[in-house]
Amino acid sequence: MRGGPSGSGKSFLAVQISTLLDAPIIEIDDFVSWDCFAGWWPRFDAQVLTTLLAGRDAVYQARDWSDWYGSSLGEWKTQPWSATIVVEGVTCTRRQTIGRLVYAVWVQAPAELRLARGMVRGRAFPGKEELWQRWMREEDAFFAADDTRNRADIIVDTSVFGVPTA
């Protein structure tokens, strides 16, 4: 699993690892929304993590991002069981995963760089920067209380990659 704050490079790293291991990726963006920073976990745990750990296919309803806010659920997805699956997204290496993950990776970058990456990601909309700043404060509080970074098996700093131009 790849955890870390928004804009840190989790998705980029997940794609690299997925390609290397020929493993599917489950994105936490299918569960989280701007209004649901950390409360998505019970649905993910029941529909995905517990199911896959039991050796069964995971069937879950993905978040609908067509309104840019992720305020509703959309299509149903099926992730066939696989010996290796990359789970990528904010707070996915939270305390509740202790003893349930093979490997936890913490991905990080300075806050200013993460915000800049967030501003070039996706489409522009009024209030985007304020949403990102609020989200980053929620992340800081969650990660401090959860002690997520200190439980990681490895820490990857993606500062060297800068801000994407496209």
Show where each model-derived region lies.
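Small-molecule kinase domains that catalyze NTP-dependent phosphoryl transfer to phosphate-bearing small molecules
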Residues: 94, 123-166
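Hydrophobic positions on the alpha1 helix immediately C-terminal to the Walker A/P-loop
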Residues: 13, 17
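Conserved nucleotide-sensing/catalytic segment adjacent to the nucleotide-binding pocket
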Residues: 24-87
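ATP-dependent NMP and nucleoside kinases share a basic, alpha-helical "lid"
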Residues: 72-121
